[in-house]
Regions:
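Bacterial carbohydrate/catabolite-sensing allosteric modules
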Residues: 1-12, 18-31, 38-173
Length: 173
Protein backbone atom coordinates (compact mmCIF):
# COMPACT_ATOMS: atom_id res chain seq x y z
CA UNK A 1 0.00 0.00 0.00
CA UNK A 2 1.35 3.39 -0.91
CA UNK A 3 0.27 7.02 -1.03
CA UNK A 4 1.13 9.54 -3.69
CA UNK A 5 -0.70 12.62 -2.38
CA UNK A 6 -0.27 14.67 0.76
CA UNK A 7 -2.40 13.41 3.61
CA UNK A 8 -2.29 16.57 5.68
CA UNK A 9 -5.04 18.24 3.62
CA UNK A 10 -8.24 16.38 2.79
CA UNK A 11 -9.14 16.33 -0.91
CA UNK A 12 -11.09 13.95 -3.13
CA UNK A 13 -7.75 12.41 -4.13
CA UNK A 14 -6.57 11.93 -0.55
CA UNK A 15 -9.93 10.37 0.43
CA UNK A 16 -9.56 7.97 -2.49
CA UNK A 17 -6.03 7.05 -1.55
CA UNK A 18 -6.99 6.60 2.11
CA UNK A 19 -9.65 4.09 1.08
CA UNK A 20 -6.89 1.61 0.18
CA UNK A 21 -6.22 1.20 3.90
CA UNK A 22 -9.74 -0.10 4.45
CA UNK A 23 -8.95 -3.28 2.51
CA UNK A 24 -5.84 -4.33 4.43
CA UNK A 25 -6.28 -8.00 5.37
CA UNK A 26 -4.88 -7.71 8.89
CA UNK A 27 -5.74 -11.35 9.61
CA UNK A 28 -3.28 -12.39 6.88
CA UNK A 29 -0.36 -10.17 7.91
CA UNK A 30 2.79 -11.32 9.66
CA UNK A 31 3.64 -7.66 10.31
CA UNK A 32 2.69 -4.18 9.16
CA UNK A 33 5.44 -1.80 8.04
CA UNK A 34 4.43 1.86 8.10
CA UNK A 35 6.46 4.67 6.55
CA UNK A 36 5.27 7.26 9.05
CA UNK A 37 6.86 10.29 7.43
CA UNK A 38 5.42 9.35 4.03
CA UNK A 39 1.88 9.34 5.40
CA UNK A 40 2.46 12.53 7.42
CA UNK A 41 -0.91 12.25 9.10
CA UNK A 42 -0.94 11.15 12.73
CA UNK A 43 -4.62 10.16 12.64
CA UNK A 44 -4.08 7.83 9.67
CA UNK A 45 -0.87 6.33 11.10
CA UNK A 46 -2.41 5.85 14.55
CA UNK A 47 -5.49 4.20 13.02
CA UNK A 48 -3.31 1.74 11.08
CA UNK A 49 -1.37 0.91 14.24
CA UNK A 50 -4.54 0.47 16.31
CA UNK A 51 -6.11 -1.87 13.74
CA UNK A 52 -2.91 -3.90 13.51
CA UNK A 53 -2.61 -4.21 17.29
CA UNK A 54 -6.30 -5.17 17.53
CA UNK A 55 -5.46 -8.08 15.20
CA UNK A 56 -2.24 -8.95 17.09
CA UNK A 57 -0.10 -7.82 14.16
CA UNK A 58 3.27 -6.30 15.11
CA UNK A 59 4.00 -2.91 13.56
CA UNK A 60 7.35 -1.67 12.30
CA UNK A 61 7.28 2.13 12.13
CA UNK A 62 9.90 3.88 10.00
CA UNK A 63 10.87 7.50 10.64
CA UNK A 64 8.15 8.27 13.18
CA UNK A 65 8.38 7.13 16.79
CA UNK A 66 5.15 5.44 17.86
CA UNK A 67 4.61 3.80 21.23
CA UNK A 68 3.99 0.07 21.00
CA UNK A 69 5.74 -0.31 17.65
CA UNK A 70 9.16 -1.46 16.55
CA UNK A 71 10.59 1.92 15.66
CA UNK A 72 13.35 2.41 13.11
CA UNK A 73 14.73 5.90 12.75
CA UNK A 74 17.51 6.83 10.35
CA UNK A 75 20.34 9.31 10.82
CA UNK A 76 19.79 11.64 7.90
CA UNK A 77 21.83 14.42 9.47
CA UNK A 78 25.26 13.04 8.56
CA UNK A 79 24.42 12.45 4.90
CA UNK A 80 22.72 15.83 4.61
CA UNK A 81 25.76 17.48 6.18
CA UNK A 82 27.91 15.86 3.47
CA UNK A 83 25.66 17.39 0.80
CA UNK A 84 25.90 20.88 2.30
CA UNK A 85 29.67 20.56 2.73
CA UNK A 86 30.06 19.34 -0.85
CA UNK A 87 28.25 22.37 -2.26
CA UNK A 88 30.22 24.82 -0.11
CA UNK A 89 33.66 23.22 0.18
CA UNK A 90 34.02 21.32 -3.12
CA UNK A 91 32.12 23.67 -5.43
CA UNK A 92 33.10 26.82 -3.54
CA UNK A 93 29.56 28.19 -3.29
CA UNK A 94 29.24 30.60 -0.38
CA UNK A 95 25.95 32.29 -1.23
CA UNK A 96 23.59 29.37 -0.75
CA UNK A 97 19.84 29.45 -0.20
CA UNK A 98 17.96 26.66 1.55
CA UNK A 99 14.52 25.25 0.72
CA UNK A 100 13.26 23.69 3.95
CA UNK A 101 10.28 21.37 4.35
CA UNK A 102 7.54 22.12 6.87
CA UNK A 103 8.05 24.54 9.74
CA UNK A 104 8.54 22.70 13.04
CA UNK A 105 8.94 19.34 11.25
CA UNK A 106 11.77 17.27 12.71
CA UNK A 107 13.28 16.35 9.31
CA UNK A 108 13.08 19.91 8.09
CA UNK A 109 14.43 21.49 11.27
CA UNK A 110 17.37 19.05 11.46
CA UNK A 111 18.34 19.85 7.89
CA UNK A 112 17.90 23.58 8.44
CA UNK A 113 20.10 23.41 11.55
CA UNK A 114 22.73 21.47 9.57
CA UNK A 115 22.63 24.04 6.75
CA UNK A 116 23.06 26.91 9.22
CA UNK A 117 25.87 25.17 11.12
CA UNK A 118 27.91 24.19 8.05
CA UNK A 119 27.41 27.61 6.47
CA UNK A 120 28.64 29.27 9.68
CA UNK A 121 31.63 26.90 9.95
CA UNK A 122 32.64 27.99 6.45
CA UNK A 123 32.25 31.70 7.14
CA UNK A 124 29.09 32.02 5.04
CA UNK A 125 26.30 34.43 5.88
CA UNK A 126 22.83 33.04 6.54
CA UNK A 127 19.90 35.44 6.55
CA UNK A 128 16.23 34.54 6.94
CA UNK A 129 15.60 35.71 3.36
CA UNK A 130 17.91 32.89 2.20
CA UNK A 131 15.51 30.32 3.68
CA UNK A 132 12.12 29.32 2.28
CA UNK A 133 9.66 26.59 3.22
CA UNK A 134 8.50 24.32 0.42
CA UNK A 135 6.64 21.83 2.64
CA UNK A 136 8.48 18.90 0.98
CA UNK A 137 6.03 19.19 -1.91
CA UNK A 138 5.81 20.52 -5.47
CA UNK A 139 3.24 23.34 -5.25
CA UNK A 140 4.54 25.06 -2.08
CA UNK A 141 8.15 24.75 -3.22
CA UNK A 142 7.30 26.19 -6.63
CA UNK A 143 5.55 29.14 -4.93
CA UNK A 144 8.57 29.74 -2.67
CA UNK A 145 10.92 29.55 -5.65
CA UNK A 146 8.79 31.98 -7.67
CA UNK A 147 8.91 34.43 -4.73
CA UNK A 148 12.70 34.19 -4.67
CA UNK A 149 12.92 34.74 -8.43
CA UNK A 150 10.71 37.84 -8.18
CA UNK A 151 12.99 39.23 -5.45
CA UNK A 152 16.10 38.53 -7.53
CA UNK A 153 14.62 40.13 -10.63
CA UNK A 154 13.51 43.16 -8.61
CA UNK A 155 16.99 43.46 -7.12
CA UNK A 156 15.69 43.25 -3.55
CA UNK A 157 17.64 40.09 -2.76
CA UNK A 158 20.89 38.62 -4.04
CA UNK A 159 20.78 35.66 -6.44
CA UNK A 160 22.46 32.64 -4.78
CA UNK A 161 25.22 30.52 -6.25
CA UNK A 162 23.30 27.40 -5.23
CA UNK A 163 20.05 26.28 -3.62
CA UNK A 164 20.02 23.26 -1.34
CA UNK A 165 16.67 21.54 -0.85
CA UNK A 166 15.62 19.43 2.12
CA UNK A 167 14.28 16.65 -0.13
CA UNK A 168 14.27 15.42 -3.71
CA UNK A 169 10.68 16.45 -4.54
CA UNK A 170 11.50 20.10 -3.92
CA UNK A 171 14.82 19.82 -5.75
CA UNK A 172 13.26 18.50 -8.97
CA UNK A 173 10.45 21.04 -8.88
Amino acid sequence: YNLSVKMDVETSHSRGELSVFSVIPYDQLAALVVLGESIRNDVVSDDLVAKAHKNNVPVVMLDRYTKGCYNIEFDYEESFEQIVRHVIEYHGCHEVNFMAGFRENNFSEQRLDTYRRVMKENGCTVKEEYIAYGDFWEIPSRAAMEKWVQEWEAGTSRRPEAIICANDMMAIT
